[in-house]
Every structure is written in structure tokens, then in C-alpha cells.
């Protein structure tokens, strides 16, 4: 299972760190994903959910 939020689709994104001299190094920004158990089609299932989805009430835990 990929580390992508089941509800919002948030996932890892890549970019660059830029120093004062504008040198660049690759970096990744990872979302705050939590493994939660939710009801999907009436059955409990473990999925990745972002902290933002949990806080906003988009997730109904079991």
C-alpha cells in the first residue's frame, strides 16, 4: 500500500533546498500520515489518513 492519504490524496512531494548562494540539493516533503482503522463498505480496514483529514472530520474511525 502506497503512503498516500486515502481521503485527501496527499503524498510525498519533492523539491529543492536553496542556499544563500542558490546552490540546490534535493529534498522531500512528507505529509503527516497516520494508520487508522475505518469502515469501508461496512468492513473495518486499515488505511493511511493525513492528520489534516483526521482533524477536519473527514475520517470516521471504528
Curated annotation (Swiss-Prot):
GO terms for biological process: translation. NCBIfam families: L28. InterPro entries: Bacterial_rp_bL28, Ribosomal_bL28, Ribosomal_bL28/bL31-like_sf, Ribosomal_bL28_bact-type, Ribosomal_bL28_sf. One of its GO terms (cellular component) is ribonucleoprotein complex. Keywords: Ribonucleoprotein, Ribosomal protein. This is Large ribosomal subunit protein bL28. Coiled coil: none annotated. HAMAP family: Ribosomal_bL28. GO terms for molecular function: structural constituent of ribosome. Pfam families: Ribosomal_L28. Belongs to the bacterial ribosomal protein bL28 family. It comes from the Bacteria.
Amino acid at each position: 500500500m502506497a503512503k498516500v492519504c486515502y481521503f485527501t490524496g496527499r503524498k510525498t512531494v519533492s523539491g529543492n533546498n536553496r542556499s544563500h548562494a542558490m546552490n540546490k540539493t534535493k529534498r522531500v516533503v512528507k505529509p503527516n500520515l497516520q494508520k487508522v482503522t475505518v469502515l469501508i463498505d461496512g468492513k473495518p480496514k486499515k488505511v493511511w489518513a493525513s492528520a489534516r483529514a483526521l482533524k477536519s472530520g473527514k475520517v470516521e474511525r471504528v
